Swiss-Prot record:
Site (Interaction with target DNA): 86
Lineage: Bacteria, Bacillati, Bacillota, Bacilli, Bacillales
Catalytic reaction equation(s): Endonucleolytic cleavage at apurinic or apyrimidinic sites to products with a 5'-phosphate
Keywords of the record: Cytoplasm, DNA damage, DNA repair, Endonuclease, Hydrolase, Magnesium, Metal-binding, Nuclease
Cystines in this chain: none
Organism: Bacillus velezensis (strain DSM 23117 / BGSC 10A6 / LMG 26770 / FZB42)
Role this protein plays: DNA repair enzyme involved in the repair of deaminated bases. Selectively cleaves double-stranded DNA at the second phosphodiester bond 3' to a deoxyinosine leaving behind the intact lesion on the nicked DNA.
InterPro entries for this protein: Endonuclease-V (IPR007581)
UniProt main location, coarse: cytoplasm
Listed cofactors: Mg(2+)
Name of protein: Endonuclease V
HAMAP family (alphabetical): Endonuclease_5
GO MF, any single term: deoxyribonuclease V activity
Transmembrane segments: none
Amino acid sequence: MKIHQIHDFDLNDESDFIRTQQSLIHKINLSPVIHPDSVNTCAGVDLAYWEQDGEPYGVCSIIVIDADTKEVIEKVHSMGKISVPYVSGFLAFRELPLIIEAAEKLEAEPDVFLFDGNGYLHYNHMGVATHAAFFLGKPTIGIAKTYLKIKGCDFEMPENEVGAYTDILIDGEVYGRALRTRRDVKPIFLSCGHNIDLESSYQITMKMINRDSRLPIPVRLADLETHVLRTFYRKNHV
C-alpha cells in the first residue's frame, strides 16, 4: 500500500509535536469521501507494547476483512523498538512509525481503517486515527475502549440498547459518540478520523459488530493478534 510521507519522526520534544499537529489540524475533513454502503473492505489497527532489557518495544497488527462476509482477507504486522518519547496527548507520534511500517506491507488497499484509539475525540482533534489518515490516504475511524476526558467534560451514558448512542459535546462541539454495541456492556467511544463524518463512522462501525465483542470485528481481531505477537516476541527476545 502506498504511504504519503507527510512528515518525518525526527521529533524529540513537545514543541515539535505541537508544531506538527498544528500544521495538520486545519486539514481535517469531516465530510465523507465514501458512502457506508460502498465499503467493501475494512482494516482494524491495534498496537501492543512491552519492555525488553529496559527498552520499550511495540508491535502493530493490521487485519483487513471483507465488509460483507467478515472473512479475513489479509493481515500484516510490524515490530520494533519505540524511539519517539511518550508525551501525554501526543501518543500518535510513538505509534505511527509502526503503523506506517505495517501498512506499507499491505497488498490490499482497505476502503476504511478502524483504529483502537481516538480520532477527533482528542485534546487537539489529533488522535492516532486522525493523524494516521494523512499517511494512509484513506478514511479512518477511532474506536476507544475508555473515555478520554477533555476539559473536564463527562459523557452521557447511552440507553442499554444495541446501537444506542449519545453525542459527546465539549464547548458546544460534537467530538464523538458514546456508543452501545452490546446490551449490559460498557459503551465504546466513537470518533471520526479524517475524510469521514460521524454518521458514516457510526453506520460502518455498527455493520462490523457481532455477538463476540463490543468492539468492531477488525479492531477486535487486530487486538487479539497484537497480544499473540507480543507474547511471541517477548518469549523469543526478538
